[in-house]
């Protein structure tokens, strides 16, 4: 058996111990562990605790600042920039969203870019935070070049995910978190850890040919052809250029040069519906929209219609009770001394 099930709290503690042992301060270790386990609870294992070993190696090599002290500067009535001091992206995105939420509550909208950052994990964590405050949340981050542009064979863009969180009155928030590539590269890593093949179309080899062996994947494809390609560029503009960071092939690689600071950028936004329309009416209409989608007749071969993020929310409810599934090799690393 190549996977093992453990309690979420045990996973958090094990991740915290590993990061703490690598010199990371307590506050940041707790936040990184929380974001990673959030992903595993939702069965998004590509962004879960499997990344711990990489983070430890990068900390020890000097590629992440273990004592980072992020600094926020308000640049306008509803805008700001957070300098992440080359610390963890999980911490920087979280702080950036906190500032965006604060501005949105007071002024209707808050937009923050984060610079001098690193990998930030699942964006759903941060937009969920806004939705829990009955605000609309949006987050984007660029990554190093691993995705070929539509019609090309050389990787120039990153997986460049984008996420939205929209609150409802009684229903769970609408959470959309997606890579603009066909899949996140973490899914390739997960398949490698679990010894599984991948669906054709996820990735290509050095010749640009589609492969199902995850060990042969050198680049990913965009989702939806030119549509995903276009959205990927938008993400690089917002989280790269707008943040004063690099883009595409000029970004330090995640899995090479572990001693290099990655200097990633992120973009987060929070919107207060009450500055645009009646707050209760908005939340009630969101309930109605979700309900109509869920009650719509399913197509042949489908059990029912789900809204984006709903399946992950159901996984989270179950996994909080039953535990999260992780690769045995990942668990063995977490338990090692």
Curated annotation (Swiss-Prot):
A GO MF term: oxidoreductase activity
GO cellular component: cytoplasm
Induction description: Induced by galacturonate, repressed by glucose.
Top-level taxon in the UniProt lineage: Bacteria
Subcellular location, record wording: Cytoplasm
EC number: 1.1.1.-
Main location, first listed in the record: cytoplasm
Assigned keywords, A-Z: Cytoplasm, Oxidoreductase
SUPFAM superfamilies reported for this sequence: L-sulfolactate dehydrogenase-like
Misc. remarks from the entry: Member of the exu locus which is required for galacturonate utilization.
Stored NCBIfam families: PRK15025.1
Membership in a protein family: Belongs to the LDH2/MDH2 oxidoreductase family.
The protein's name: Uncharacterized oxidoreductase YjmC
Organism of origin: Bacillus subtilis (strain 168)
Native organism taxonomy: Bacteria, Bacillati, Bacillota, Bacilli, Bacillales
Gene label: yjmC
């Amino acid at each position: 058996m190549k996977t093992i099930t453990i309690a979420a709290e045990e996973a958090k503690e094990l991740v915290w111990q590993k990061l703490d042992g690598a010199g990371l301060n307590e506050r940041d270790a707790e936040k990184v562990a929380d974001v990673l386990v959030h992903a595993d609870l939702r069965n998004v294992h590509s962004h879960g605790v499997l990344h711990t070993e990489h983070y430890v190696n990068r900390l020890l090599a000097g590629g992440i600042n273990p004592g980072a002290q992020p600094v926020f500067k308000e640049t306008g009535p509803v805008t700001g920039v957070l300098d992440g001091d080359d610390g963890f992206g999980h911490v920087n995105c979280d702080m950036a969203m906190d500032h965006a939420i604060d501005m949105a509550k007071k002024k209707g909208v808050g937009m923050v870019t984060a610079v001098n950052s690193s990998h930030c994990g699942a964006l759903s964590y941060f937009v969920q935070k806004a939705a829990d405050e009955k605000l609309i949340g949006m987050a984007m981050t660029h990554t190093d070049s691993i995705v070929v542009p539509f019609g090309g064979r050389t990787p120039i863009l990153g997986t460049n995910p984008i996420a939205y969180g929209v609150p409802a009155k009684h229903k769970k928030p609408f959470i959309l978190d997606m890579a603009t590539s066909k899949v996140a590269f973490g899914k390739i890593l997960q398949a490698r850890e679990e010894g599984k093949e991948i669906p054709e179309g996820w990735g290509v080899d050095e010749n640009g040919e589609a492969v199902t062996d995850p060990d042969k994947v050198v680049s990913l494809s965009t989702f939806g052809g030119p549509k995903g390609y276009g959205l990927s560029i938008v993400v690089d503009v917002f989280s790269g250029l707008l943040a004063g960071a690099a883009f595409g092939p000029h970004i330090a690689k995640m899995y090479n040069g572990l001693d290099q600071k990655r200097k990633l950028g992120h973009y987060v936004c929070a919107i207060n519906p009450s500055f645009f329309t009646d707050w209760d009416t908005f939340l009630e209409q969101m309930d109605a929209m979700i309900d109509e989608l869920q009650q719509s007749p399913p197509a042949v071969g489908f059990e029912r219609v789900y809204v984006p993020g709903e399946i992950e929310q159901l996984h989270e409810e179950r996994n909080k009770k039953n535990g999260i599934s992780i690769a045995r090799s990942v668990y063995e690393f977490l338990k090692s001394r």
